[in-house]
């Protein structure tokens, strides 16, 4: 019988060593049955709820905004080089994605920071830059954004690997 040992090959995934003699073969199971992809109708309802009246172009970008890098395909060559075998996708799970939200997050972080700075500049006309910087940091930090995402229900559509789900990253805020 093979000995199973959890090891860490990458920050976003856990693989299981299935070797008996240290031959370094690994099994990777990222599939998460809790994932639910957001639909166009759900996007429309969410935007309408907050009075955001914009047409939905490029639905794929809205959907990609919810894809964590842990639920993306790794290059086959990387898997082969590291002796990693991807388990078969269970029927109740979504396919792994080819792209994550990271590049969109990079843009979004910049837009959010710009909006926060503009708001604070207008809202506190006599405040010094130290106060505005500290307040901006509090507004745009992950814990704040995670709490707001939970409050408005965005967490329902995050696409995360099973391991990332176990680390409770669907709720990326401190309580």
Q: Whereabouts are the PLM-identified features?
A:
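RNase III-family endoribonuclease catalytic core
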Residues: 2-175
